[in-house]
């Protein structure tokens, strides 16, 4: 276990957006908003344990031998290392493809909703109260970079171009940008045509094209200059999108959300095709929470009820596997063995490339 990291004073505060939050971090609505991009409004999170503003010092995440089996909302690669984040400030890392996990020392007990690494050392995690954590040692130790308790707005996703430049998205149209690795964060929500302050659930890079943001009420935004300017995209669907993945060819975008809705574009969002998802002949209606394009080119999308979708043709078609435990899933990466590492309602699990359980001796 690493030594406790030093406390760093949060830099700045986010200005209020046009939709003022009317909830506190303990309410069911707050938990719903923080999970909306990953668990299709499942109300799975335990109450967020916010630190009292009057309490001195730092409340570190409680060490638990069961952390790898509790709610985890996202997982990412830090080079060959895997890093997962979730409930009560838990951040775990694995150096053996997910077979074993070590809990990092983390200066919060807030619910963490997303984690992202720009390289094998520099990473960020975001969560409740606009909390942003940073690491420069591959996830072993973490420091707080930003927080806005007054706003009580959960951040829902984070993406970095490199070790210096990145964005965090969140509820009520929050969009934060840093150009110095997280030392300072600027509210740049006014770059978006989002006057209603719709929730921004996910952000991703579309290789060869730019950045793409998806959110509630069919919200879609794209940037061809790495976030300096943004254009609103005409959406093929007016429900909520929870995730977006770039394909293997320039311009390919796969966006997905409520009730099994999944759409594919080959021209960076100018036009869209609805992708039919079937379960024994019936339309898939599970909420789709997160996705990833693996090193071998497969696109994997996971969601409610143990849904695992896999595509070997850059998102033109998907095969469905419903995990027998029906536990909801919120994140996926591949490991060196070609298997999938899933996170969600029951923590972390290594499964076969299709999503099926591995033989006992391989788990």
What are these regions (language model features)?
Residues 16, 32, 47-50, 168:
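Short stretches within intrinsically disordered, low-complexity N-terminal or propeptide regions
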Residues 11, 27, 42-47:
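Short, intrinsically disordered, low-complexity terminal segments
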Residues 7, 49-363:
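Residue-level hotspots at or immediately adjacent to binding/recognition sites across diverse folds
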